[in-house]
Curated annotation (Swiss-Prot):
Protein name: Metallothionein-like protein type 2, MT2-28
Job description of the protein: Metallothioneins have a high content of cysteine residues that bind various heavy metals.
Keyword Nucleotide-binding: no
Family as reported in the entry's similarity comment: Belongs to the metallothionein superfamily. Type 15 family.
Coiled coil ranges: none
GO molecular function list: metal ion binding
Segment forming the signal sequence: none
InterPro entries given in the database record: Metalthion_15p
PANTHER family the UniProt entry points to: METALLOTHIONEIN-LIKE PROTEIN 2A (PTHR33543), METALLOTHIONEIN-LIKE PROTEIN 2B (PTHR33543:SF33)
Domain of life: Eukaryota
Keywords, ordered alphabetically: Metal-binding, Metal-thiolate cluster
């Protein structure tokens, strides 16, 4: 029988935790609470004319590639 009906959450170090499934931020789980965030913009800068070159680099957050198998063991780290 699988833990959480096969919907295990992957935490740090590709270890399965909780029942939240594979999330973008694997160490965070749903707690049923809501949070309100406010953003205040204090000023604006003038537009700048610049050219940027694409560097071709790709950044991946650490431990966000876990995939949990049906027995709540990470089965390879491939969930993104």
């Amino acid at each position: 029988m699988s833990c959480c009906g096969g919907n295990c959450g992957c935490g740090a170090g590709c270890k399965c935790v909780g029942c939240g499934g594979c999330k973008m931020y694997p160490d965070l789980s749903f707690s049923g609470e809501t949070t309100t965030t406010e953003t205040l913009v204090l000023g604006l800068a003038p537009a700048m004319n610049s050219q940027f070159e694409a560097s071709g680099e790709t950044f991946v957050a650490e431990n966000d590639a876990c995939k949990c198998g049906s027995d709540c063991k990470c089965n390879p780290c491939t969930c993104k």
